[in-house]
């Protein structure tokens, strides 16, 4: 119990003055940060930069995957981006829990994500949002935030055609396979995903309690019965 209490006290020390922060600075002093990165690190002084660099050093592989070749398929980009953000975001949260006091959390969260953004074309706020969407399984919001409007996402749908025959057979819809393939090809047409994203952005989130527009009710017309003619009476 005494050992665990000691560890808890150690974790509660403020980062700027705590022993953990000083040890991080001492270890990072042996490997000075590259001037090119420091120059682009707006709001990060050298000491803060060294602390962030030292703490995230074990995750170099995931930092590199935030900036992937442009010719890489979109599906793989999404996969690597999600994996990297989950690992990096969880690591940052661990840092905030174990090394920061309550009043320091906001500052160091901002600094650590700003350091991560140096390895990506996206800003720190965007990366934090993508991490949040990934953790909450909000795929639609993730795609809207990550995929640019002019980038067709046909590669994300390409593998769906392979699974169509199996699905149709399992559900007894073999005769509808051609029709489903035709609809899928329309979805994969150039510009179609971009148009869908534009429509989603234009609509925006629907407020709670808001009702969907209803079609005007048509007035029922009373049909007057025709008077009986002499022929019908016979």
From Swiss-Prot:
Region span, Disordered: 1-38, 200-234
Key words of the record: Cytoplasm, Nucleus
Protein origin, superkingdom: Eukaryota
Main location class: cytoplasm
GO cellular component: cytoplasm; nucleus
Domain observations: The CHD1 helical C-terminal domain (CHCT) may bind DNA and nucleosomes.
Name of the protein in its database record: CHD1 helical C-terminal domain containing protein 1
Protein's organism: Bos taurus (Bovine)
């Amino acid at each position: 119990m005494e050992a665990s209490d000691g560890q808890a006290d150690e974790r509660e020390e403020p980062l700027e003055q705590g022993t953990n922060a000083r040890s991080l600075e001492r270890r990072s002093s042996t490997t000075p940060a590259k001037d090119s990165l420091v120059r682009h690190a707006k709001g990060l002084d050298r000491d803060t930069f060294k602390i962030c660099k030292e703490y995230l050093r074990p995750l170099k592989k995931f930092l590199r995957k935030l900036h992937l070749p442009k010719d890489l398929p979109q599906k793989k980009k999404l996969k690597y981006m999600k994996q990297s953000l989950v690992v990096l975001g969880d690591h940052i949260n661990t840092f905030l829990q174990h090394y920061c006091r309550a009043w320091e959390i906001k500052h160091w969260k901002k600094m650590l994500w700003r350091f991560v953004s140096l390895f990506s074309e996206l800003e720190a706020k965007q990366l934090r949002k993508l991490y949040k969407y990934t953790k909450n399984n909000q795929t639609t919001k993730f795609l809207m935030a990550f995929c640019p409007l002019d980038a067709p996402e046909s590669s994300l749908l390409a593998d769906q055609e392979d699974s169509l025959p199996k699905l149709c057979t399992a559900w007894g819809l073999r005769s509808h396979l051609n029709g489903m393939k035709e609809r899928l090809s329309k979805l994969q047409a150039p510009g179609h995903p971009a148009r869908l994203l534009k429509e989603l952005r234009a609509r925006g989130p629907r407020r709670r309690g808001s009702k969907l527009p209803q079609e005007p009710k048509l007035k029922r017309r009373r049909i007057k019965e025709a008077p009986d003619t002499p022929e019908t009476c016979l």
